[in-house]
């Protein structure tokens, strides 16, 4: 008995070491990219500015995108990060938070799999399988997104539903719904599963709460900030919902051609293959991800059906828990083989796609000691902390903690600014209020055309071989 307890403890320590190692490695990796000017306004600087404004008790109107932070996405989960901004001035803190949130997503899967498979060793394997999944590591290096909390929170939702830990269930459901307005697409199917397999009343309430929260976020919160409830209707093919349903029923072959076009089959292959499709043995838990997978495949937005972007992370917990759930329902004599197959597939796809040590995929060279990076940071001192600034987009991620900062060519020429992301080209009314501009010494043709019209109103106050800082006359 003592030996068994010692073995269980060692496997748990191993999982904690695995999670800590992952979190520290990706913290180091992503902070290094940020310090090497590898981050940008989209999608890091805008969150850094918004949370910083909240930490100063100001309205989080993010000038890097021209929208309120909660009008862009209803990510009220970010309010829990605000206190960190009271105690640190590091612009890298969000990358550390994200890495630990993603790393901790392995813990609920370990807690469930060690019990469901009656093996701490298999629990350890599945904790590693989660961290090896390409959608986890690639989300970790894709700037910063509140979606990174969903690996942990949806994992806790599934663990608590499967184990009937109802207090944990409701806490994690509420927190998950605070991450983003469309999280209901995963929580509603989980609620339906709970209603059918665990507790009818709790499952129905999950669906009702999820639908109500989604309606509140779209129709009240986001509409009040941006004037529109749903800014991304352009992502629905065939002209919108009506056209999509019409094609689905009248021209199903056209819909099939669309769903098998571009990289969509490859995306599905990369998403599902790390599980060795073991969830097919009992697919009900894995199927809770079907709505999100379908939405990603249907979307006209290229990024949604690419494994390298954050849209896929929310799917991973359902696939992982579904895989364990499926394996737990086959005869014991086959379990080791199935777990072995999952481990091999995860290692293969982790090596192929995930930005892990010794893996095939890398994030490029973003060194803080690069002369151009050092030169940029030297010139930051020329710009006052309270100045209104327009800067080249990688620089905005370093300068975001101020009330007003714009990603050049904004506000001199609109680009990805305001509720309508397609509005572009006009000079915004407050362009004359910009006090400082920081640009590279060599501009592309479009940027040079914009700046040639504005530069007579500015003088050079700092420069080097790579960068120039201008101040309004």
Language model feature labels by segment:
Residues 1-28, 114, 120, 199-202, ...:
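Start-transfer (signal-anchor) and selected internal transmembrane alpha helices
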Residues 100, 104-132, 151-152, 168:
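Transmembrane-helix signature of polytopic, membrane-embedded enzymes
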Residues 16-20, 208-211, 329-355:
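Signature aromatic-anchored transmembrane alpha helix within multi-pass, membrane-resident enzymes
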Residues 46-69, 76-77:
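Extracytosolic helix-loop segments that constitute the early lumenal/periplasmic catalytic or substrate-binding loops
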């Amino acid at each position: 008995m003592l030996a068994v307890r010692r073995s269980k403890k060692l496997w748990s320590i191993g999982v904690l070491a695995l999670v800590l190692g992952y979190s520290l490695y990706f913290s180091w990796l992503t902070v290094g990219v940020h310090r090497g000017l590898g981050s940008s306004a989209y999608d890091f600087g805008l969150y850094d500015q918004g949370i910083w404004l909240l930490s100063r008790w100001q309205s989080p109107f993010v000038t890097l995108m021209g929208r309120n932070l909660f009008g862009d996405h209803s990510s009220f989960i970010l309010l829990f990060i605000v206190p960190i901004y009271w105690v640190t001035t590091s612009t890298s803190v969000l990358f550390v938070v994200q890495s630990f949130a993603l790393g901790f997503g392995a813990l609920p899967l370990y807690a469930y799999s060690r019990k469901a498979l009656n093996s701490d060793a298999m629990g350890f394997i599945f904790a590693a399988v989660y961290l090896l999944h390409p959608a986890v590591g690639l989300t970790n290096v894709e700037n910063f997104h509140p979606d990174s909390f969903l690996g942990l929170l949806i994992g806790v939702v599934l663990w608590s539903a499967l184990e009937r830990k109802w207090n944990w269930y409701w806490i994690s459901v509420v927190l998950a719904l605070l991450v983003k307005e469309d999280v209901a697409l995963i929580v509603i199917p989980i609620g339906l599963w709970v209603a059918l397999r665990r507790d009818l009343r709790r499952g129905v309430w999950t669906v009702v709460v999820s639908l109500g929260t989604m309606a509140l976020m779209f129709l009240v919160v986001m509409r009040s900030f941006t004037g529109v409830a749903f800014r991304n209707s352009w992502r629905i093919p065939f002209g919108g919902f009506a056209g999509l349903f019409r094609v689905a029923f009248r021209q199903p072959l056209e819909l099939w051609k669309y769903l098998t076009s571009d990289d969509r089959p490859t995306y599905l292959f990369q998403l599902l293959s790390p599980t060795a499709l073991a969830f097919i043995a009992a697919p009900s838990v894995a199927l809770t991800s079907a709505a999100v997978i379908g939405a990603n495949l249907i979307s006209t937005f290229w990024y949604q059906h690419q494994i390298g972007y954050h849209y896929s992370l929310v799917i991973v917990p359902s696939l992982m828990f579904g895989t364990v759930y499926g394996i737990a329902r086959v005869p014991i004599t086959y379990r080791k083989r199935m777990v072995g197959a999952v481990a091999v597939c995860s290692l293969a796809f982790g090596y192929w796609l995930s930005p892990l040590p010794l893996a095939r995929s890398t994030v490029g060279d973003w060194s803080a000691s690069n002369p151009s990076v050092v030169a940029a940071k030297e010139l930051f001192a020329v710009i006052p902390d309270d100045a209104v600034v327009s800067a080249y987009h990688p620089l905005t991620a370093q300068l975001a903690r101020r009330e007003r900062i714009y990603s050049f060519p904004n506000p001199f020429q609109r680009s990805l600014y305001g509720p309508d992301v397609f509005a572009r080209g006009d000079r915004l009314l407050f362009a004359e209020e910009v006090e400082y501009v920081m640009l590279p010494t060599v501009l592309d043709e479009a940027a040079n055309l914009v700046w040639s019209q504005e530069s007579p109103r500015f003088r050079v106050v700092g420069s080097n071989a790579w960068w120039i800082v201008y101040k309004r006359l």
